[in-house]
């Protein structure tokens, strides 16, 4: 998340909108506001979340932000990102969110993001990916399990795996890159990788 916050400074502009897709508790949104407030105090910040379980957290986060500075234009909305209209955006972020969407819906959302960005605006995102080669996929998966066992029990790991198995719809990096290109992005660059996870930036 620190990379996303620091990269945001290159794109956030006054009189534009910044959208945080799948904002959950609003932690990233708040951090980006604070990081950019010294040079950009007239932007609109929108956190979009679909899960009702975050309503109370987002109310508290809104109060935290506006208590410090009532002039900050920020809102958290409960909405399916597939129905959201991106307008006048300088930056859109998505941290491990689009990977839960079917490919068709993901392509449509990425196209909507591209159309809603200013020229020079950016889409910064992170996703879990899968490998094209089954052997490499197994190696990365088991290596990740070994890493997780340092903190969690095997039972905890497998319970989470079973929970996410039918919810997550990961793609290969090549498929993700193709979706971005089809939407119109021509400048696409990964900036972070860890096991099967990747963070990348796509600039319009």
Residue ranges and their predicted role:
Residues 1-14:
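Conserved alpha-helix/loop element of class I SAM-dependent methyltransferases that forms part
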Residues 83-87:
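Short conserved loop adjoining the S-adenosyl-L-methionine
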Residues 128-182:
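C-terminal alpha-helical "lid/dimerization" subdomain adjacent to the S-adenosyl-L-methionine
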Residues 93:
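A conserved beta-strand element that flanks and buttresses the S-adenosyl-L-methionine
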Residues 186-204:
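Core SAM-dependent methyltransferase catalytic element
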Residues 107-119:
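A short glycine-rich, Lys/Arg-flanked "PGG" loop and its adjoining helix->strand segment in the class I
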Residues 19, 24-82:
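Class I SAM-dependent methyltransferase SAM/SAH-binding core
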Residues 120-128:
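Conserved beta-strand signature within the Rossmann-like core of class I S-adenosyl-L-methionine
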């Amino acid at each position: 998340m620190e990379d996303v916050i620091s990269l945001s400074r290159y794109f956030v502009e006054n009189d534009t909108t910044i959208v945080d897709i799948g904002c959950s508790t609003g932690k990233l949104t708040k951090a980006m506001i604070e990081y950019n407030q010294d040079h950009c105090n007239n932007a609109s910040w929108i956190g979009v979340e679909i899960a009702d379980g975050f309503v109370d957290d987002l109310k508290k986060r809104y109060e935290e932000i506006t208590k410090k500075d009532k002039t900050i234009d920020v809102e958290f909305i409960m909405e399916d990102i597939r129905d959201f209209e991106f307008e006048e955006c300088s930056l859109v972020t998505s941290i491990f969110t689009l990977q839960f969407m079917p490919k068709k819906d993901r392509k449509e959302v990425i196209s909507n993001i591209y159309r809603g960005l200013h020229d020079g605006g950016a889409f910064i995102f992170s996703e879990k990916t899968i490998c094209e080669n089954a052997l490499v996929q197994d190696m990365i998966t088991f290596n990740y399990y070994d890493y997780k066992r340092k903190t969690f029990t095997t039972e905890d790991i497998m319970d989470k795996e079973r929970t996410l198995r039918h919810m997550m719809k990961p793609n290969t990096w090549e498929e993700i890159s193709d979706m971005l290109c089809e939407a119109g992005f021509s400048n696409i660059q990964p900036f972070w990788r860890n096991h099967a996870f990747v963070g990348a930036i796509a600039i319009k």
